[in-house]
Amino acid sequence: MSITTERKQQLIKEYAITENDTGSSAVQCAILTERINNLTEHFKSNHKDHASRRGLLILVGRRRRLLNYIKKNNISEYLELISKLGIRKVK
């Protein structure tokens, strides 16, 4: 259910701006998206897990705020990121 260290390192390599970049907004959005996707799969078999559903909503809100920040500062980076992650635009 949780994201593995290897998968996190792979996401950091893929979305990092520089080699040692682990905290940029794009990297954080990619990691949050992976966690959200894992929780979504979890809910397919555990639909009554309401405590985890609250955690999912918190993660989605955190990702939405990060995407709003990226959209406000660099619209081209935002459009590229949402297409790579396969998510819809933030309203």
Swiss-Prot record:
InterPro entries: Ribosomal_uS15 (IPR000589), Ribosomal_uS15_bac-type (IPR005290), uS15_NS1_RNA-bd_sf (IPR009068)
Gene3D superfamilies in alphabetical order: 6.10.250.3130, S15/NS1, RNA-binding
Record GO terms (molecular function): rRNA binding; structural constituent of ribosome
Ribonucleoprotein is among the record's keywords: yes
PROSITE patterns on file: RIBOSOMAL_S15
GO biological process: translation
Summary of the function given for this chain in its UniProt record: One of the primary rRNA binding proteins, it binds directly to 16S rRNA where it helps nucleate assembly of the platform of the 30S subunit by binding and bridging several RNA helices of the 16S rRNA.
Name of this chain's protein: Small ribosomal subunit protein uS15
Organism name: Rickettsia canadensis (strain McKiel)
Lineage of origin: Bacteria, Pseudomonadati, Pseudomonadota, Alphaproteobacteria, Rickettsiales
Name of the coding gene: rpsO
